[in-house]
Design a protein with these regions (language model features):
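Short solvent-exposed coil/turn linkers within tandem alpha-helical repeat scaffolds
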Residues: 1-5, 34-48, 76-89
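Long amphipathic all-alpha helical oligomerization modules
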Residues: 48-50, 57, 69
Length: 99
């Protein structure tokens, strides 16, 4: 059965609500990968960084700054045209976990 990236992300959010952060992060990363593979014309690319950002925030909430930083840097490098990167918003996240 094929699920959509949004459904995969919703599953991740459900895990997060129940305190299962590792599983939540895994689901959100998978959702981003799924969104990327569906993005033949870059339309879905705007959603993948959002899923990754959620994963990074969850890692941050667990004080796993190193993993969060890796995700934030990946967003900045891979999704240069996303609003998150264009607005320099991602830099705030990178700066926060780099302290």
């Amino acid at each position: 059965m094929m699920v959509s990236p949004a459904a995969q992300a919703a599953l991740g959010n459900a895990y997060a609500q129940n305190g299962n952060i590792d599983k939540a992060v895994s689901c959100l990363k998978k959702a981003a990968d799924m969104a990327d593979s569906k993005a033949e014309d870059d339309t879905n690319n705007s959603i993948a960084p959002t899923f990754l950002l959620q994963a990074g925030e969850l890692l941050e909430s667990q004080n796993n700054k190193a993993e969060a930083l890796k995700i934030y840097q990946d967003i900045k490098k891979k999704y240069v045209n996303s609003q998150l990167v264009q607005s320099y918003e991602i830099d705030k996240y990178i700066e926060r976990v780099s302290e």
